[in-house]
């Protein structure tokens, strides 16, 4: 499966400008099967959901559907959504064959996200081209129990607005998640400065199941990151090094 990830700046709380920007990027994109966008790719990481949130079937989801159909590609990215009186940081998954979503479970309290958005309660794993992909958002990366591989996924996706001062944690934890879960990991972060003056260095990466980079970006630089992943290679490694057989049993409560 061919992966493309967009490390990009974001126009602050400006859906139309961001959608136009990404439309142009996607039109220039080479052949790919899966496209991964940053967290809150239409607005930036805003704690003003009453200003930016859209309906569950809003313009961003319609745009994702259009892009998926036009380019015959699966596409994923998160947006602020209002549904049943609550706001969610919702990661949409749209492919030509299916559609799903994951609501961010771990809300970033240091920015007050937990006071503005409701937490999702369940993990979401989707299937595409023979791979099982687990959808996660930013702060979820810090919680290995929640994103632990229960022998139910092959690719772990993190979309993020992860600030530059904590870039070491971002890179280190992505590598750890790949190694401990024997899974490909895609980590996509934004670059530039947001409306609150917070800077983002990007450091987006696609890792193999050994934690080794298949593709990585230059910090602070907009980029299209591409790599190809192999299910046969992943299965071969898991058979030769079946660490999951010695994993401790646990359950989430």
Task: Label the model's feature ranges.
Residues 7-12:
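Short polar catalytic/cofactor-binding loops
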Residues 1-5:
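Extreme N-terminal starter segment of soluble prokaryotic enzymes
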Residues 59-73, 142-222:
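CN hydrolase (nitrilase-like) catalytic-core segments centered on the catalytic cysteine
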Residues 15, 23-95, 100-101, 163-177, ...:
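Cys-nucleophile CN-hydrolase/nitrilase-fold catalytic domain and related Cys-dependent amidase chemistry
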Residues 82-151, 165-172, 236-243, 253:
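Active-site catalytic loop in hydrolytic enzyme cores
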Residues 77-79, 90-93, 124, 204-206, ...:
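Short beta-strand scaffold segments in enzyme catalytic cores
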Residues 33-34, 133, 155:
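Structural motif
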């Amino acid at each position: 499966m061919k992966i493309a990830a967009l490390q990009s700046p974001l126009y602050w709380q400006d859906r139309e400008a961001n959608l136009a920007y990404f439309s142009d990027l996607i039109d220039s994109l080479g052949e790919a099967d899966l496209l991964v966008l940053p967290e809150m790719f239409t607005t930036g990481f805003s704690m003003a959901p009453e200003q930016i949130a859209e309906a569950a079937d809003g313009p961003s989801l319609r745009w994702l559907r259009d892009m998926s159909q036009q380019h015959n590609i699966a596409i994923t990215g998160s947006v602020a959504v209002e549904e049943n009186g609550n706001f969610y940081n919702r990661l949409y998954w749209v492919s030509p064959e299916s559609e799903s979503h994951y609501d961010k479970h771990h809300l970033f309290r240091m920015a007050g996200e937990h006071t503005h958005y409701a937490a999702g309660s369940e993990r979401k794993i989707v299937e595409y081209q023979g791979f099982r992909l687990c959808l996660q958002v930013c702060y979820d990366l810090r919680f290995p129990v929640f994103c632990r591989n229960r022998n139910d996924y092959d690719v772990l996706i993190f979309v993020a607005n992860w600030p530059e001062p904590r870039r070491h944690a971002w890179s280190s934890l992505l590598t750890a998640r790949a190694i401990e879960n024997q899974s490909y990991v895609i980590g996509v972060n934004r670059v530039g400065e947001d409306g609150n003056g917070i800077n983002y260095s990007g450091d987006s990466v696609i890792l193999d199941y050994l934690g080794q980079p298949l593709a990585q970006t230059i910090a602070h630089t907009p980029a299209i990151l591409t790599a190809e992943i192999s299910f046969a290679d992943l299965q071969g490694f898991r058979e030769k090094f079946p660490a999951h057989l010695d994993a401790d049993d646990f359950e989430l409560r």
